[in-house]
Amino acid sequence: MKNTRFVNWWKQDKRYITLLKAVLMALLPLVCCLIRTAAEGRSIGQVYLPSSEWNDELFYFKQVEGIVNYGFPMGYFGFNESHALQLSFAAWSPVLVFPWILWGLVFGWNLLSPVICNIVLMTVTMFVFVWLVKPTWKQLGILTVLFGLYSLFVRY
């Protein structure tokens, strides 16, 4: 009987440690975004999509905007401003922007929507990842450093 109580206590205690790890890792995307924007002298609310170094973000933003407002993309989204053969997705499928479409339909769509949506999706993903994998503190530290150093994740 004593042995069973100890085992149950141990399992329950590990669950709270895993929860703590998952919450800490879930905050990482937001913290990295805050650090990156602070290094640029801005806040997350001042991220302006059209002035992006790459043009893909605006391209996807306009596709989602058309889908949210009209049910399908409006405009020319093919290569060299050509029109796609079917619908207006060119070489891309609607699956690529599907999470943004759902976000836009539920919460509305503006220039900050992709940024907030990406942070929320990365936060949920990090939480679920740590909850399922249950990494050690050392592994969690390594993941944190690697995520922080990979600026493409932080940028998006």
PLM regions with names:
Residues 38-46, 56-86:
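Extracytosolic helix-loop segments that constitute the early lumenal/periplasmic catalytic or substrate-binding loops
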Residues 106-107, 127-142:
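Transmembrane alpha-helical segments of multipass membrane enzymes and assembly factors
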Residues 19, 23, 116, 141-142:
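Hydrophobic alpha-helical transmembrane segments
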Residues 90, 94-97, 110-125, 144-156:
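Aromatic- and kink-enriched transmembrane "portal" helix at the membrane-lumen/periplasm boundary
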Residues 27-39, 124-132, 150-153:
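Residue-level signal for alpha-helical transmembrane segments in multi-pass membrane proteins
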Residues 51-54:
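Juxtamembrane membrane-water interface segments immediately C-terminal to a transmembrane helix
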Residues 1-44:
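Start-transfer (signal-anchor) and selected internal transmembrane alpha helices
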